[in-house]
């Protein structure tokens, strides 16, 4: 039979073939095809012949062809055919589809839909035919009557697609079904339907099946719905990641985790590669991705940005055209996230409305961790982004050798966080990916070497962290060694940071150490001073960190880096003898540098103590070096005055005078080394011969210091040739030399005071010597102060910083104020009897703390050891606190004879600084710090006390002090003390938990002070109100507070209409005639601006959320109702309340007779701001008012309030300001300065007026639009007809200033008209909103 069919098919006509096929039964023909197909015998030829004999032009032929198609589809789906045979059959069927009449095409397509619905398909191979059938059906323009209504081919196609998308798709041929639609021409509606269907199927698949489905979906997206496809993929993986994190965090469900992390992240990586590849082929897809993610920034960023989408963006940076846009988007997202976080943390009002989301920085660091799962396509983007953040947001400016941030406090904090995030990205990437470590290290070091004019501390910190993590990465040491070649060209601070960072590597790499020493030796003899400084810094660092065998262990180690982290025994690599020889060679090199400039010597003297303490076996060499140096400037004759050759310390070079030898620092170094030797070495000595020689050296040094002490006390001003008649001007060589010598003497006196205190053992004679040394110090200090007052500038801060160590300052204060031991009383009375010495001790303490605030460390031994500094701060604070609370300022000042601040006031100033320092540098140790100040009981009791409770205890002490001060007579009010107390309370209040009862008590107390105590001191009022506002915003919104204050200001200053009598309110006594303006007025306006910023932020938030909801409605309408986060209705209500209260606030202020100047200017700007915010709120309702809820009543009331209570009085205030300007008095020729001042005031006050009028009119314009759109008359309370009763002309200002008589008359007439128009408004009482 098959042969006959084939032979008949060769005829030119098909008549015989058709006749023969008609004689066959359908089952016979189907069996023939099946047999041939299963056997694989030229089934294609047979099928081609059968189709040739079944023309669609005839009804029988078309039906037979339809049955053949059905039979072949079943054959292909049976799985009995070989792959090539099945493909051949499908190929032939595809070629013949377009011949089918429309009704049969509908039937064929319906068969496929039924097969999918009933899950009759086995392998889905036949689905390749479906797109051809649908395409052919869409070409049928005629109406097809198939029992389903009269529709044309395109409409049937739409109906079939709709049906197909509504049935359940079997999981095993999901991918084939999706690929069906890529070859079908789809309308946007059909496309959305298909995409939504495929996206809903993601959750029903195994993880490994998702990437190929995503690939098909991306191919399909070239037809449209790109944003829906991307949004759906991102949303799916966002939820999957979230679910995975929740499962991992729950121990109970650890066995039920849906998928292992490895599998999930590998799948995500594959999907990201598919998307990036699709974007390379279809750039529009990339643009849609960026548009989608940018739009998401306006609402809730966490709905768009997640670890998956961030990883996708970072992978996208490999496509050059998108690189810059992606990094800009990520930078914006990071900065916005940090700003939002800070805004939320600083406002209780926002915290109650907006839940805190996951920060973008956390997501990025999660991407870094996930990138370990073969995300090589992400790592390069991570590295680039890390460096972009560090370059963009690192410190930009160096001031006095210190990196300085530029901008507002908010932007500074944001920049610091962004820069730190960049460093964390790079460090974590370095830890995870071995392949890119070299690149990260090279880029960091390139920036360290090339950026000599900008701060690079953040890069040095990163470099140090990298080495600390992996000190054994010797394969990278070649790049570090190359960097050493640039040391001589780098700033000293950079060199020190770089060398500290590489310490661990120097300990384990001999070649690196040798390379560094070679560079340092060359630098030691360089012509540039900075290069020699770098060499000295490097050698000192090596001496500190390469211990000679037998050195004492240092419990006071300042540089834990390389000592605790790197567990490498140096002596296992280098012998003890070699190490000692190496260190002694360095000391010999440093000895030669003692003949160089003062700056070099200074570095050595400041560094030798640390070397000695860390490497005690070098003590003999170091002390011998110092001894030899001192002998050059020491007068050995015991009766010779003065005991030091001060002239030799000063060098004259041509016409210039320089300090050659910092003798005071030399003595300081010797004194500290001696003290260390006596406390650490002497107790361990065994009496060896070498030790006896050392003992002789130390004894001789002691004798020299004793002799210097005695002779310095005996020396008079004339002995130094520096009496009061001497020249101290900075313009002559003699004057400069005398200044240098005087400063040296003062430094020597300080060193000797500390030395004698350390050996005194509370001896009365020693304390008398200390007081005599102080008298000598005071003489020169007074002379320099007196001469500096007459001359130009004082000496530089380098020599004016006190040489007393922080430890000594702490011990001295404790002895002076807290030592109550009976045996010490007589000797201490010597020091305590001198008020000037007591003042000096506290002043030096303040100076040391100020130095710590300024630089982060203090001069002297242990000045860079954070632990030692912290311990000294605790001791100092405890003493200052006791002294201030025990002897109040009022008591001390009543019997005070000395000029200047009292000791109690200085103690309070010290307390204010120490509290600030601890919060700035020692935040993690606050609990320990407060515990040191207040011993409350046993250790068990101490452990249960929180930081809030401890801080509250301290706060109460200062509250009592402030209350006592405020309760005193007005003449006894000490403004300086009050300001310091407020500053201390402000600092301590930051330690209180805002939800605690202690915080509420602090707020209530501050409120009570503001309400009950009236002080006319503007500075005190400003500090107190700032404290009040800073507390209030963490408790609730301050808008009602602002309204009450505005009423008080209005009552104190009066109305702009002098005929109106104001009913005074007394909410806050702190608001009085002296403080109401400008102090309180500017404060409340500033606070109102912050509230408006918060409201603007909320409006942007709900506006973005509305956009997101609109987009999500298009994709998944069923989810729209569930997307109620954040609760926009609550936010809208809160916004209305805020704006309504602020309208009443401005209503009061705008009617207040404010003095000319900053108050008027700031108020006009504030009014412009509230109208801009109102306009933004109206625009939001223009966007959402089409929803069923329409315009809420509260919004209508807000519009009514603004129209009746704000806009009219705004115009009155504008006229008031302009009239005040026009009433400026005439100025004679002699008063030109006054004219210029008047001009500046007029220009400043009237400049914001056009902006305000524009803001009002914009608000009214959008109100009109909203009225039309919402069918609600919102303009009924806006009096447009009387809005302009004045003119805004620049020429008016000139007229005022020129005092032209004719113009003056015209202006007066205009004012009269204005007066007449506004008369009814002025007669009403201004207390309607109180």
Curated annotation (Swiss-Prot):
There is a cross-link at residue 522 (Glycyl lysine isopeptide (Lys-Gly) (interchain with G-Cter in ubiquitin)). Residues 1299-1330 are annotated as: Disordered. One of its GO terms (cellular component) is nucleoplasm. The modification Phosphoserine is found at residues 555, 729, 1122. The C-terminal 30 residues are probably required for function in DNA repair. The gene is Fanci. Residues 1321-1330 have a biased composition (Basic residues). Belongs to the Fanconi anemia group I protein family. Disulfide bonds: none annotated. The modification Phosphothreonine is found at residues 558, 948. It is found in: Nucleus; Cytoplasm. Homodimer. Part of a FANCI-FANCD2 heterodimeric complex that binds and scans dsDNA for DNA damage. Interacts with FANCL. Interacts with MTMR15/FAN1. Interacts with POLN. Interacts with UBL5; the interaction promotes FANCI homodimerization. This is Fanconi anemia group I protein homolog. Keywords: Cell cycle, Cytoplasm, DNA damage, DNA repair, Isopeptide bond, Nucleus, Phosphoprotein, Ubl conjugation. One of its GO terms (molecular function) is DNA polymerase binding. GO terms for biological process: DNA repair; positive regulation of protein ubiquitination. Plays an essential role in the repair of DNA double-strand breaks by homologous recombination and in the repair of interstrand DNA cross-links (ICLs) by promoting FANCD2 monoubiquitination by FANCL and participating in recruitment to DNA repair sites. The FANCI-FANCD2 complex binds and scans double-stranded DNA (dsDNA) for DNA damage; this complex stalls at DNA junctions between double-stranded DNA and single-stranded DNA. Participates in S phase and G2 phase checkpoint activation upon DNA damage. It comes from Mus musculus (Mouse). Monoubiquitinated by FANCL on Lys-522 during S phase and upon genotoxic stress. Deubiquitinated by USP1 as cells enter G2/M, or once DNA repair is completed. Monoubiquitination requires the FANCA-FANCB-FANCC-FANCE-FANCF-FANCG-FANCM complex. Ubiquitination is required for binding to chromatin, DNA repair, and normal cell cycle progression. Monoubiquitination is stimulated by DNA-binding. Phosphorylated in response to DNA damage by ATM and/or ATR. Phosphorylation of FANCI promotes ubiquitination of FANCD2, which prevents DNA release from the FANCI-FANCD2 complex.
């Amino acid at each position: 039979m098959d042969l006959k069919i084939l032979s008949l098919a060769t005829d030119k006509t098909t008549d015989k073939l058709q006749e023969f096929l008609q004689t066959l039964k359908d089952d016979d023909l189907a069996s023939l095809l099946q047999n041939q197909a299963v056997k694989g015998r030229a089934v294609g030829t047979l099928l081609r012949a059968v189709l040739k004999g079944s023309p669609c032009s005839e009804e029988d032929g078309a039906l037979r062809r339809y049955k053949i198609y059905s039979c072949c589809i079943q054959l292909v789906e049976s799985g009995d055919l070989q792959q090539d045979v099945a493909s051949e059959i499908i190929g032939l069927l595809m070629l013949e589809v377009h011949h089918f009449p429309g009704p049969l095409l509908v039937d064929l397509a319906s068969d496929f839909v039924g097969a999918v619905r009933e899950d009759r398909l086995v392998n889905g191979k036949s689905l390749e035919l479906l797109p051809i059938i649908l395409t052919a059906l869409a070409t049928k323009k005629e109406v097809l009557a198939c029992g389903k209504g009269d529709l044309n081919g395109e409409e049937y196609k739409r109906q079939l697609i709709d049906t197909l998308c509504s049935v359940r798709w079997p999981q095993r041929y999901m991918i084939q079904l999706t690929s069906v639609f890529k070859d079908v021409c789809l309308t946007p509606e059909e496309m959305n339907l298909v995409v939504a269907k495929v996206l809903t199927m993601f959750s029903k698949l195994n993880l490994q099946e998702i990437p190929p489905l995503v690939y098909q979906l991306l191919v399909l997206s070239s037809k449209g719905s790109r944003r829906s496809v991307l949004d759906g993929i991102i949303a799916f993986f966002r939820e999957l990641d979230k679910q995975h994190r929740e499962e991992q965090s729950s121990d109970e469900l650890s066995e039920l985790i849906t998928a292992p992390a490895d599998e999930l992240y590998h799948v995500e990586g594959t999907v990201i590669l598919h998307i990036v590849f699709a974007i390379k082929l279809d750039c529009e897809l990339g643009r849609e991705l960026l548009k989608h993610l940018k739009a998401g920034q306006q609402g809730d960023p966490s709905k768009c940005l997640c670890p998956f989408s961030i990883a996708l963006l970072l992978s996208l940076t490999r496509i050059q055209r998108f690189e810059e846009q992606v990094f800009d988007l990520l930078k914006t997202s990071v900065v916005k996230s940090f700003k939002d976080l800070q805004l939320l943390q600083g406002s209780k009002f926002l915290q109650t409305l907006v839940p805190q989301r996951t920060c973008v920085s956390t997501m990025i660091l999660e991407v870094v961790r996930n990138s370990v799962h073969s995300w090589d396509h992400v790592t390069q983007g991570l590295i680039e982004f890390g460096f972009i953040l560090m370059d963009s947001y690192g410190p930009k400016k160096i001031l006095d050798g210190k990196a300085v941030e530029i901008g507002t406090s908010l932007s500074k904090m944001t920049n610091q966080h962004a820069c730190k995030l960049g460093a964390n990205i790079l460090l974590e990437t370095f830890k995870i990916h071995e392949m890119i470590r070299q690149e990260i290290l090279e880029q960091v070091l390139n920036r360290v070497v090339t950026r000599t004019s900008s701060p690079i501390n953040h890069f040095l910190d990163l470099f140090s962290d990298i080495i600390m993590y992996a000190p054994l990465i010797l394969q990278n040491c070649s790049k570090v060694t190359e960097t050493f070649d640039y040391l001589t060209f780098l700033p000293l601070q950079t060199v020190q940071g770089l060398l500290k960072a590489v310490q661990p590597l120097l300990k384990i790499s001999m070649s690196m150490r040798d390379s560094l020493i070679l560079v340092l030796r060359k630098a030691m003899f360089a012509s540039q001073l900075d290069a020699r400084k770098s060499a000295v810094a490097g050698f000192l660092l090596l001496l500190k960190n390469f211990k000679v065998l037998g050195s004492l262990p240092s419990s006071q180690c300042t540089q834990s880096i390389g000592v605790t982290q790197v567990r490498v025994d140096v002596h296992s690599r280098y012998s003890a003898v070699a190490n000692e020889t190496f260190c002694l060679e360095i000391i010999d090199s440093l000895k030669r540098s003692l003949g160089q400039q003062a700056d070099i010597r200074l570095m050595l003297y400041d560094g030798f103590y640390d070397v000695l303490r860390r490497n005690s076996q070098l003590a003999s060499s170091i002390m011998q070096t110092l001894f030899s140096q001192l002998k050059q400037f020491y007068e050995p004759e015991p009766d010779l005055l003065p005991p030091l050759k001060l002239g030799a310390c000063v060098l004259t070079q041509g016409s210039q005078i320089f300090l050659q030898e910092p003798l005071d620092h030399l003595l300081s170094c010797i004194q500290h080394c001696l003290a260390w030797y006596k406390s650490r070495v002497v107790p361990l000595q065994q009496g060896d011969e070498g030790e006896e020689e050392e003992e002789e050296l130390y004894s001789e040094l002691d004798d020299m210091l004793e002799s210097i002490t005695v002779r310095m006390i005996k020396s008079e001003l004339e002995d130094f040739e520096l009496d009061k008649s001497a020249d101290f001007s900075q313009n002559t060589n003699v004057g400069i030399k005398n200044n240098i010598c005087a400063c040296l003497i003062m430094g020597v006196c300080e060193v000797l005071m500390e030395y004698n205190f350390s050996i005194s053992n509370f001896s009365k004679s020693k304390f008398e010597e200390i007081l005599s040394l102080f008298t000598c110090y005071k003489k020169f200090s007074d002379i320099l102060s007196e001469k500096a007052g007459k001359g130009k500038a004082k000496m530089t801060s380098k020599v004016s910083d006190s040489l007393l160590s922080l430890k000594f300052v702490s011990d001295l204060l404790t002895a002076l104020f807290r030592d109550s031991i009976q045996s010490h009383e007589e000797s201490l009375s010597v020091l305590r009897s001198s008020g000037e010495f007591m003042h000096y001790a506290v002043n030096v303490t303040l100076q040391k703390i100020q130095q710590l605030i300024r630089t982060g460390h203090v001069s002297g031994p242990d000045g860079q050891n954070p632990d030692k500094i912290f311990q000294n701060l605790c001791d100092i604070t405890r003493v200052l606190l006791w002294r201030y609370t025990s002897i109040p300022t009022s008591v001390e000042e009543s019997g005070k004879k000395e000029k200047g601040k009292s000791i109690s006031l200085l103690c309070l100033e010290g307390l204010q600084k120490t509290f600030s320092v601890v919060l700035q540098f020692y935040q993690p140790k606050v609990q320990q710090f407060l515990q040191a100040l207040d011993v409350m009981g046993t250790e068990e009791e101490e452990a249960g006390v929180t930081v809030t409770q401890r801080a509250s205890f301290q706060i109460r002490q200062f509250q009592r002090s402030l209350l006592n001060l405020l309760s005193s007579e007005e003449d006894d009010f000490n403004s300086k003390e009050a300001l310091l107390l407020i500053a201390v309370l402000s600092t301590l209040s930051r330690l209180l938990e805002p939800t605690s009862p202690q915080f509420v008590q602090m707020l209530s107390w501050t409120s009570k002070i503001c309400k009950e105590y009236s002080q006319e001191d503007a500075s005190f009022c400003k500090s107190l109100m700032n404290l009040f506002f800073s507390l209030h915003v963490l408790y609730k919104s301050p808008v009602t507070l602002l309204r009450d204050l505005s009423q008080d200001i209005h009552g104190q200053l009066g109305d702009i209409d002098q005929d109106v009598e104001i009913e005074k309110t007394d909410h806050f006594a702190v608001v009085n005639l002296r403080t109401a303006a400008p102090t309180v007025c500017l404060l409340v306006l500033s606070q109102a601006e912050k509230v408006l910023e918060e409201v603007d932020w909320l409006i942007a938030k709900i506006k973005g959320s509305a956009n997101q909801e609109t987009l999500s409605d298009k994709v998944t309408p069923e989810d729209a109702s569930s997307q109620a986060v954040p609760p926009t209705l609550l936010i809208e209500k809160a916004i209305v309340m805020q704006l309504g209260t602020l309208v009443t606030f401005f209503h009061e202020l705008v009617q207040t007779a404010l003095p000319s100047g900053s108050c008027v200017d700031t108020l006009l700007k504030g009014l412009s701001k509230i109208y801009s915010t109102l306009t933004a709120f109206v625009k939001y309702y223009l966007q959402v008012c089409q929803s069923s809820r329409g315009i809420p009543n509260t919004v209508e009331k807000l519009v009514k309030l603004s129209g009746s209570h704000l806009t009219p009085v705004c115009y009155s205030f504008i006229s008031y300001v302009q009239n005040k300007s026009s009433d400026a008095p005439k100025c004679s020729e002699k008063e030109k300065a006054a004219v210029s001042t008047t001009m500046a005031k007029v220009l400043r006050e009237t400049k914001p007026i056009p902006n305000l009028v524009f803001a009002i009119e914009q608000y009214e314009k959008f109100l009109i639009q909203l009225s039309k759109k919402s069918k609600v008359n919102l303009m009924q309370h806006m009096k447009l007809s009387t809005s302009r009763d004045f003119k805004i002309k620049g020429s008016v200002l000139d007229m005022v200033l020129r005092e032209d008589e004719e113009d003056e008359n015209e202006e007066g007439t205009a004012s009269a008209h204005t007066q007449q128009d506004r008369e009814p408004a002025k007669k009403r009482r201004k207390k309607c909103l109180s």
